Amino acid sequence: MGTHARKKASLLLLVLATVALVSSPGWSFAQGTPATFGPIFEEQPIGLLFPEESAEDQVTLACRARASPPATYRWKMNGTDMNLEPGSRHQLMGGNLVIMSPTKTQDAGVYQCLASNPVGTVVSKEAVLRFGFLQEFSKEERDPVKTHEGWGVMLPCNPPAHYPGLSYRWLLNEFPNFIPTDGRHFVSQTTGNLYIARTNASDLGNYSCLATSHMDFSTKSVFSKFAQLNLAAEDPRLFAPSIKARFPPETYALVGQQVTLECFAFGNPVPRIKWRKVDGSLSPQWATAEPTLQIPSVSFEDEGTYECEAENSKGRDTVQGRIIVQAQPEWLKVISDTEADIGSNLRWGCAAAGKPRPMVRWLRNGEPLASQNRVEVLAGDLRFSKLSLEDSGMYQCVAENKHGTIYASAELAVQALAPDFRQNPVRRLIPAARGGEISILCQPRAAPKATILWSKGTEILGNSTRVTVTSDGTLIIRNISRSDEGKYTCFAENFMGKANSTGILSVRDATKITLAPSSADINVGDNLTLQCHASHDPTMDLTFTWTLDDFPIDFDKPGGHYRRASAKETIGDLTILNAHVRHGGKYTCMAQTVVDGTSKEATVLVRGPPGPPGGVVVRDIGDTTVQLSWSRGFDNHSPIAKYTLQARTPPSGKWKQVRTNPVNIEGNAETAQVLGLMPWMDYEFRVSASNILGTGEPSGPSSKIRTKEAVPSVAPSGLSGGGGAPGELIINWTPVSREYQNGDGFGYLLSFRRQGSSSWQTARVPGADAQYFVYGNDSIQPYTPFEVKIRSYNRRGDGPESLTALVYSAEEEPRVAPAKVWAKGSSSSEMNVSWEPVLQDMNGILLGYEIRYWKAGDNEAAADRVRTAGLDTSARVTGLNPNTKYHVTVRAYNRAGTGPASPSADAMTVKPPPRRPPGNISWTFSSSSLSLKWDPVVPLRNESTVTGYKMLYQNDLHPTPTLHLTSKNWIEIPVPEDIGHALVQIRTTGPGGDGIPAEVHIVRNGGTSMMVESAAARPAHPGPAFSCMVILMLAGYQKL
């Protein structure tokens, strides 16, 4: 080849190398130069719902991508490139698309953003721009709705044209008097119609439907014309439920969406709503008695058939429908940025889940990719043969079904590089152990892959019994000796060029274990030490590591069972503390330096309680028995002696041991019969094994089963009753809990008769939750005794009957008023009232008396009331006004109410006590007593007389106060010599009660010295307050 030709070839190689370097992600010619990479979306457009009547004059669809060099943007609408010329209604601001003055006819559609730079192009996910609207209701008057009182009724909403869906409320007569959502009223959020299960007089009026549209940044509401509801008066009749608001036979939903099923029925009494899942169990968190069943975030487990049941005492009605759950595409496997050598093969794959199953297609730089030449497209697989530089670019895997489309993006960079050791040279210093083995890596960066040669000094190395060069270029030297020391060089070459890198091999003494661990056999809870000692090259550090069944042991785990020796570098003993069964296995001690290592093994056997049995299977299911079988678990090196069976039910959730046949289950058994179960009950079972070392962990629970149905085996309890309206017999009982119902179609059978009668009447009350029955008959006299019995039933038959209970019909108010009522004021705020008792009559059980009292001149309707707790014939009434005349009446009462009033009596409360405390207090102090004196308190004309004074005394030695009474205006109080502090209160007393106190504080300072402070309590009304303080320093006493 001539000089000119060689220069031309060299230049071509340089150009190729330059192209390859530039095409490589992350490559830069100088430190700090930004890497080149394709667009990566940081913000993609999302769908918008734009109100047609919005005051906003533009819509913005966001798009932003990170790229180097920075990306440029363009947009597609409905798959066609958009004209984004300056001055048009569609403007590009950065990557965002701004639509000016949007209209439905011109701008509704599907939008996509495309981001490009020299590396390639990527396409965003689709964003749909929709336009929402809500028209006004018709201006025509609505026809009145007529029905009979007690019947059910539906008022149609007939909403105007709209998009998207609406929410609904109803007004009664005026805004904002909204119809409540209760068991009797229901507003369908599907149709907007208002349903009333059973009408009554309170429902009369004018009704208007309020429809509200919620859009992305706007809310609008419209009202319908009022429609009048008229009710024809009629004695309400009882009728069975009839479901009027029904959910459809099929409801489709996407995973994660909220699903709402509506169900509402007419009926009298108002029906109870109950939901269940026909082909599975309804999650407890969705269980409800409301007219709507809401699943906030539906999943595939929620798919199935659902039933709504409306039930009252006259019958039941049901409706069924199926929820079908589907899903948008979701990635299971995606592609990632890839660097590949020129001329190599590449396979990319992506996979997506969804329902229906998503279809997968591929894009390259935003354009569809099909099989051609070296590229093969097979659904989720993309395969390249003999990659070339033009295969570099941005690729996208697209998965789509009818519910949505998802995109996964990645950059493919095809490289052509001469060998280069700058990033990964051969290790400069390579220590190795004598007699051991060393692997020296040779990993230059090169594309295509370089050919590797090794040399020691000037000698080229080939494969031999001790030396091997692997296919990836690694040099392996075995059975190392001192003669192997020296320089080793790796030579790498491909069609782009060549390079080499050198390292120096240094040979060291080998590591040896001098005391190996020994195998051992221990019980659970024992401690054990495994010894491990080693020798090593003194110029290097030695470390010990331990593994159990080839997994490293974590010595730093809090509360762990392992400890290791740390006294000497050559000792690596392992101690096992409080051994468990899981600590048995193969222990390996490894002694290592940076150049070599060696290991020894020992087996530790830990005997313990058995492991959990497996595969618990339930078969031969009866009403009270099942047959269990299981497989043996590990005996943990000690024979299994017996098995224990347990069961749990949903009501309790607690595991309980069950009776079995045989009673004692031996260790070689793998089946047993369970006895004494409850019929029609969900059960799970588990099995535990025991040996001489204890009982092991139980098995996992069996699959849940339900025992067969049987007739009820217990009678309802808590049979009682009473109360209600005249002519009624109310019978109450405690509902039978789920575990005693024994079957579906559960209810109650009542038998009752008047006491002394020979014939029984019966009534059937459906529903397990029922807890009362009302029997009405105008011929029933007040407080008539009835004999009552109850039993439960299910679809298998009737259960046992309860004992007979005596229940009384409704009471009526007492018919006789108390006589000889007497009342007299006893203080300024109290009066005493007495009367003659009322004889018990046949209307009911007399509970006590009600006293009504009101001020003279007031209306009796404003009277205050107080009741006695029993049959006392006198009472004290408190909280009265002083010097006030009161009228008083007394009535007898029972559970039905109060009887007629007695003739009224009058009482006058006493004038109030003086509102001034005793004043001008003086005292004389001796070694053991304190004499106090004060000015007499003279009452005013509107105050009661003073008959004496009350003295309250308390000191710090005896915190319980002592009360003293005196008719004089002085008193002598004992004062112990060793007191530190005392408190005295003085107040008036008389017919009007006690007055306001004055206080005296006594503090001893030392010896016979003391400080006395008197303070008059502040009056209740505004007025002056007086206090004075005097210090006594005399050995005897001082008169103030």
Curated annotation (Swiss-Prot):
**What phylogenetic lineage does the species belong to?**
Eukaryota, Metazoa, Chordata, Craniata, Vertebrata
The UniProt similarity line reads:
Belongs to the immunoglobulin superfamily. Contactin family.
Lipid-linked residues (GPI-anchor amidated alanine):
1015
Record-level GO BP terms: adult walking behavior; axon guidance; axonal fasciculation; axonogenesis; cell-cell adhesion; cell-matrix adhesion; central nervous system myelination; cerebral cortex GABAergic interneuron migration
- Record keyword Cell membrane present: yes
What name is this protein filed under? Answer: Contactin-2
| Species | Rattus norvegicus (Rat)
Q: State its role.
A: May play a role in the initial growth and guidance of axons. May be involved in cell adhesion. In conjunction with another transmembrane protein, CNTNAP2, contributes to the organization of axonal domains at nodes of Ranvier by maintaining voltage-gated potassium channels at the juxtaparanodal region.
Its membrane topology is listed as: Lipid-anchor; GPI-anchor
Taking the record's annotation, the residue ranges forming a coiled coil are: none
Q: Where's the motif Cell attachment site? A: 796-798
Localization in the cell: Cell membrane
**Domain of life according to the entry:** Eukaryota
A GO cellular component entry from the record: axon initial segment
For the Ig-like C2-type domain, which residue ranges apply? 39-130, 135-224, 241-324, 329-413, 419-506, 511-605
Region listing for Disordered, in residue ranges: 895-921
Q: What is the gene name? A: Cntn2
Q: Does the keyword Cell membrane apply?
A: yes
